[in-house]
Amino acid sequence: MQGKLKKLWLRIVLFIAGFAGVFIFLYPFVTKGIKNIGNLTGVVLGICLILYAAWFHRVNRRVKKWMTRTAGKVICGIVLLIVLVAVGFAAAGTICMIRASKSAPKDETVMIVLGCGVNGDRPSLMLTERLDAAYDYLNTHEEVVCILSGGQGKGENISEAECMYRYLTEKGIAQDRLYKEDRSTSTRENLLYSKKIIEEKNLDPQVIIVTNEFHEYRASVIAEHTGIKPSAVCGNTAWWLLPTYYLRELYGIVFEWIF
């Protein structure tokens, strides 16, 4: 009886976790139209938990039956290995994200704000988070100049660099402290083209990178490859966006490690 009760509670927990996962990862898509490999992965994992909870006993019986056969043991072993490798990469990536986001600025005099999306001619929520973090730092460190990096994408009336420039100048940051880099279409290009501005203007290659906390690690790795020495100022990601972009970033980190 006690064993049945434990299994019942486990199924309930799996159902709740599955439905919560589907909701959390679908919410950005439903409300903001955000769709990427992060929320796709989250929704698929949530559905898998729901299906497992629904067919709990049937799945367990089938696995036990497979485990009596050599082929079944091999398949289960491969699946377990894949899961362990995925969990290992996720854990390592998470640790790297956290450590990079804690890399506080020292006496750097150059800042790079990485663009991430414009709605018409206004910054997206995530870009606003980055810009607010940049503004707070620039407002209290008047010796710091700032490179605003981001080209013009689909659905954007102006470049991300121009949008950031307008946002910061409207809030009172002096125009002569801001440089626009408006050709980039990826994090790698953000930093490569910003490096050219640093060299052209004879600026210090030790820079502060402003992006969201989950993105700081990969941005810092790419920066180091281009010869930039980075520290971090992070925009605080809205809680309902973080799971989606966290999972997407894990894919980006693994890709960066492998390739």
Positions of predicted regions on the chain:
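Internal/C-terminal transmembrane anchor helices
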Residues: 68-93
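Membrane-interface helix-boundary motifs at transmembrane edges
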Residues: 2-5, 33-34, 59-74
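Structural signature of transmembrane alpha-helix termini at the membrane-water interface
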Residues: 23-30, 54-58, 88-98, 254-258
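Hydrophobic alpha-helical transmembrane segments of polytopic
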Residues: 13, 17, 45, 78-85, ...
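Membrane-embedded alpha-helical segments of integral membrane proteins
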Residues: 9-61
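A structural signal for short, hydrophobic/glycine-enriched beta-strand patches
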Residues: 91-248
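Intrinsic structural disorder
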Residues: 1-7, 18-22, 112, 134
